[in-house]
From Swiss-Prot:
SUPFAM superfamilies per record: DNA-binding pseudobarrel domain (SSF101936)
Organism of this sequence: Arabidopsis thaliana
Official protein name in the record: B3 domain-containing protein REM13
Chain segments carrying region Disordered: 121-147, 423-449, 606-625
Compartments (UniProt record): Nucleus
Lineage: Eukaryota, Viridiplantae, Streptophyta, Embryophyta, Tracheophyta
GO cellular component terms given for this protein: nucleus
Length: 1045
């Protein structure tokens, strides 16, 4: 070991499987550690320590917890400094660099320019070891010598190399030679960094008692970000002002690994060391640097604007690089195409490129744009979005954005730091407040953008081997990469913060089979992270997930308990569109209800709304189930492990492989490549290759496409197969085609019947007659036709519809139905439907008018709670009292606008549970009905179709008519008989004595020519057999008139 060093130390590069243990160099171990069994690790600049056990030269127990807590990763270079008493100070120097302080206090550049080969000695480097001669390039020696000589000549200059640890801890430690030579004391609490011109920033300067060094904190990360510097880049600093507040002039240069290319002329007053270092950077280039190079500038306060400055010979440049902060703030992180829009409205399609270093740039097309618009010197572009396509629009020199930027520049000049020292403290405070406001604004915009572009209640988890544990976040979503080695799973802070998960307790994991598992929700005080307890591993195994699999969890709430529900693979977040979905895609994915209730729009943009009622949650679950059914997800239940459903996708055809369900393959021990037979319904066998990829996924290979063509399977179709065994050879026997997505088949049936079925099932009204086939018996299930299921689903939805559910379809978004509950009366608020408020842009508190049927207006407040739920406040109870609306009553209102003022107009009271009203009538007839009350004569009733009947997709029948004919207690099926003798199925439901004609009414009216406002007669046909379905015979006014004459 080097005797001149204060503390002995060694270095180690983290390699795969570093979590399990760490090997101490042999000479270091024999001199300091040998014979000891316990040591203590302490991260630099932290008071917390970890106790680890020593097993010979290995650090074992406790090491894993240490690296996980401090987020060590593969490739990081870690320094271990032994301070005595079996205590190590550990420093993470970031990837591919190591730091050795020289006894003369030389610049860090000498140490970081040497790239060390860590492949030998398990990645360990001791102080006493010499670097291999072949690794010391000539350029490195020259650079290090230049730095050494320059730094010794002028102690007012130093170079700061940016490491990943610096950015993580938001600190920069100043070299000892610099702080000691320039007389820094603990009275120095602030430091000013300036480029010698307009830009400057005030940062905190602190002293580290443990190491005896000064460091910059609280703002270093933002300073690097604003100057486009990442890990590996470096700054050249020169001391230009002393006193209580130090002033450093800086010059950002390119990174050592070539990530950035920011050029500027050196200031005349910079020291010789800066000049020599800049010369070193110039010598490193393989191509001589031209006199001019393009660069883009960016202002944090105007994140949509980017300004390009071009050199005279810009024609030689192939790509035009975009500013790193600009692309990061605006979420432009994927290659593709981008449009350049000039001042005449013309669009220029330009390629958007992404290099291996993560730099985004404009490719082919930007030069033509520059030439056509005479922009040879430079120009400013504004980012706008057309759906998911970015567009850069050319800004004129007189644009508001330019004037705003000039004002900002002037404001910065006014706050220049090179003024009267007496005003320095005042300026520092102003700058601090300004910086803090900028940070708050940036955080607000980032939070808002991420909420809009991503599904904040979703988190995607990828299971990797133990060596690849990391947590990463992107602009589009929350992504966690975890290892099954760990007992708990840390959740991303963005995910927990956005969803308000900040307290330890219990959380429920909901599997794909509907099985719930309780696990602990833990809180780590050290880093403020929330994590799932050890029960998450059982959840992963029970749902057939293994190393290499990715799965998405959706956060839902059951009362106050968070629930993470497992989403199927095809319902994962759409990342390619930035986490969102276009309206076109939404419309395509919306489920269509039967014609009786037209099209009901569901919120597929899935935003977590904790204010939804329980019936909304049930509705969402039913829609999810319907979506899974139509998409053809795996239907293999755990009790039917021998059955698997396969779906032909474009990826299957392109890669010539048909993936088997992981659960199916695991439960049937199909885990090795080989051969498998496919048996079709005609008894023909097809020998198919069975493949296994690197992730362990099993799939059908060569031969399956011929099998599919022989059985007339097309793209998008699904079919079910049963696994049987012939000796030791597996065989998949075809059962039937379950789903077909071709448009030609959609009109008939989603499922095609098996070839052996003699005829399709007979479907008439509410009766279906299927034929039981051998395949049905073998599969232990019977598939009902989709037409028949549609009728059942329509009746179920109509029943839920009449139980108090919101009745406003997407085509009638201006209608909303309220139900008065005891909670509404107690809290003096009437909640607006979340869908109604969203579709009508009612999202801000204020006032609204309630318009009754007499034309009177009632001014009512509109409230918005913490969860974003909109409701009617003060004034609605007076309105309800006037209209004699009581608890349990429901009424419908229509939203209209008077200029910019919203007005809710009362249509009618729909249902009432008040016992006092049962004897009379449950609903109030609207004034728009032609007659004041329906005409009831014996078994005839005359009605008029109103707008409310069309809106509700049903007709309310008077209770007097039902009682007079003794059918007020006959609920269920009913038949409507048209004038042409055609029978139409209907359904009668009861709500506290009210009988409604629901299913089939709209189609019946259209077929019989009943129009809005037209009077018609329904006749009850007296059936002698009370067990049969009641019949209502329809007669139009014209028919009645002819019969009378």
């Amino acid at each position: 070991m080097a005797n001149s060093r204060i503390y002995p130390q060694f270095f180690h590069t983290l390699v795969p499987s570093f979590h399990t243990h760490l090997m101490i160099p042999e000479d270091f171990f024999s001199e300091y550690i040998e014979g000891r069994s316990v040591a203590e690790l302490k991260l630099d600049f932290s008071d917390k320590s970890w106790e680890v056990k020593l097993s010979d030269r290995r650090i074992t127990d406790g090491w894993e917890e240490f690296v996980v807590a401090n987020d060590f990763r593969i490739g990081d270079v870690v320094a271990f400094r032994y301070v005595g008493n079996l205590v190590f100070h550990v420093s993470n120097l970031g990837p591919n660099y190591y730091e050795i302080e020289h006894n003369d206090g030389e610049s860090l550049l000498r140490k970081r320019l040497h790239q060390v080969d860590f492949s030998s000695n398990n990645g360990d480097v001791c102080d006493s070891e010499e670097l291999p001669k072949e690794k010391k390039a000539k350029t490195n020696s020259e650079e290090a010598d230049a730095v050494s000589s320059s730094s010794s000549a002028d102690k007012s200059c130093f170079m700061a190399i940016i490491t990943a640890l610096d950015l993580t801890t938001d600190t920069l430690y100043l070299p000892l030679h610099f702080t000691s030579a320039n007389g820094l004391t603990r009275k120095n609490r602030e430091i000013i960094l300036t480029d010698g011109g307009e830009r400057s920033r005030v940062l905190d300067l602190r002293f580290d008692e443990s190491s005896g060094t000064f460091y910059i904190s609280r703002g270093w990360r933002n300073f690097c970000d604003e100057n486009g510097q990442k890990a590996g880049g470096f700054f050249l600093f020169k001391l230009v002002g002393k006193g209580e507040t130090l002033v450093l002039s800086f010059c950002p240069t390119e990174s050592i690994n070539g990530e950035e290319n920011i050029t500027r002329e050196d200031s005349k007053d910079e020291c010789s060391s800066l000049d020599s270092l800049m010369n070193i950077v110039e010598k490193k280039k393989y191509i001589p640097k031209p006199r001019g190079s393009p660069y883009s500038s960016y202002s944090p306060s105007h994140k949509q604007f980017v300004t390009f400055t071009l050199p005279p010979d810009y024609a030689r440049i192939g790509k035009l690089s975009l500013s790193a902060p600009f692309v990061r703030e605006n979420g432009i992180n994927k290659p593709g195409e981008i449009c350049l829009l000039d001042k005449h409205g013309r669009k220029w399609l330009t390629s958007l490129l992404l290099d291996s270093k993560g730099t985004m740039s404009l490719g082919k097309g930007w030069k033509e744009f520059v030439k056509a618009n005479s922009l040879e010197t430079g120009f400013t572009l504004k980012l706008i979005w057309e759906e998911t396509t970015p567009v850069l629009s050319l800004c004129s020199p007189e644009s508001n954005s330019d004037r705003e930027q000039e004002e900002i520049s002037k404001a910065i000049e006014k706050h220049s730091l090179f003024i009267d020292p007496s005003n320095r403290d005042k300026i520092s405070n102003n700058d601090k407040e300004e910086n803090m406001s900028w940070e708050r604004k940036k955080d607000h915009l980032k939070s808002r953008d991420s909420t809009l572009s991503s599904q904040k209640q979703f988190v995607t988890i990828t299971i990797t081997p133990s060596s690849d544990r990391l947590v990463s976040l992107s602009n589009d979503s929350c992504l966690v990469v975890v290892s099954l080695l760990y007992f708990d799973m840390r959740l991303p802070k963005v995910f927990t913060r956005e969803n308000g998960i900040n307290k330890p307790g219990r959380i429920t994991l909901l599997g794909k089979d509907g099985i719930k598992q309780q696990t602990n929700l833990l809180f780590d005080k050290a880093n403020g992270a929330m994590s799932l307890g050890h029960g998450w591993k059982d959840f992963v195994k029970d749902n057939g997930l293994k190393t290499g699999d990715s799965f998405t969890l959706k956060l839902i709430w059951e009362d106050q308990t968070p629930v993470l529900s497992l989403c199927p693979a095809d319902c994962s977040i759409d990342r390619e569109a930035g986490g969102g979905r276009s309206e076109t895609n939404q419309k395509k994915s919306l489920p269509i209800e039967p014609s009786t209730c037209k099209k009901i729009r569901k919120d597929v943009n899935i935003k977590d709304d904790n204010s939804k009622e329980k019936n909304d949650k049930e509705e969402s679950k039913s829609v999810d189930g319907e979506r899974k059914y139509l998409r053809g997800t795996y239907l293999t239940p755990s009790s039917q492990k021998h059955f698997v459903t396969l779906t032909i996708t474009p990826s299957s055809i392109k890669k010539d492989r048909l993936i088997l369900s992981p659960q199916f393959a695991r439960k049937n021990n199909i885990d090795k490549p080989g051969m498998i037979y496919l048996l079709d319904t005609d008894g023909t066998k097809w020998l198919i290759s069975l493949q296994r990829d690197k992730k362990g996924t099993m799939s059908l290979g060569k031969g399956w496409k011929e099998f599919a063509e022989a059985n007339d399977f097309k793209l998008g179709e699904s079919f079910t197969m049963e696994l049987v065994w012939e000796d030791t050879t597996p065989m998949l026997s075809l059962l039937r085609t379950e789903f077909r997505s071709s448009k030609a088949n959609e009109k008939e049936s989603i499922s095609s019947e098996h070839k052996t079925r003699e005829s399709s099932p007979t479907i008439k009204n509410r009766i279906v007659t299927p034929a039981l086939t051998p395949e049905d018996v073998k599969a232990c299930k019977l598939i009902l036709p989709s037409q028949f299921m549609k009728k059942i689903r329509t009746v179920d939805k109509e029943r839920n519809h009449l139980k108090g559910r919101d009745l406003n379809p997407s085509c009638q978004k201006q209608f909303v139905t309220f139900t008065i509950t005891p909670t509404c009366v107690g809290k003096n608020r009437l909640i607006l439907s979340a869908q109604f408020a969203r579709e009508n842009n009612i999202n801000q508190p204020g006032t609204i008018y309630l318009l009754d049927t007499d034309g009177r207006k009632w001014l009512t407040t509109v409230k918005r709670d913490k969860k974003g739920t909109m409701s009617l406040g003060k004034g609605w109870k007076e309105f309800a009292d006037t209209k004699d609306l009581k608890s349990g009553d429901s009424f419908t209102m229509e939203l209209i606008w008077e200029d910019t003022n919203p007005v809710l107009s009362l249509l009618r009271t729909k249902f009432s549970s008040s016992k006092s009203n049962k004897e009379e009538s449950i609903f109030l007839e609207p004034k728009s009905r032609d007659s004041s009350s329906p005409t009831i004569v014996n078994r005839f009733v005359t009605l008029a179709l109103t707008p409310e009947d069309v809106t509700a997709c049903k007709l309310i029948l008077p209770s007097q008519f039902m009682k007079a004919n003794g059918i007020n207690n006959k609920l269920g099926k009913i038949t409507l008989l048209g004038e042409n003798g055609v029978e139409w199925p209907g359904y009668m439901l009861s709500l506290d004595g009210t009988l409604a004609l629901g299913n089939g009414w709209e189609g019946f009216c259209e077929a019989n020519g009943v129009k809005l406002g037209q009077t018609f007669t329904l006749e009850f046909v007296n059936e002698q057999d009370t067990t049969t379905t009641p019949v209502l015979k329809f007669s139009s006014v014209e028919t009645i008139y002819k019969n009378v004459n």
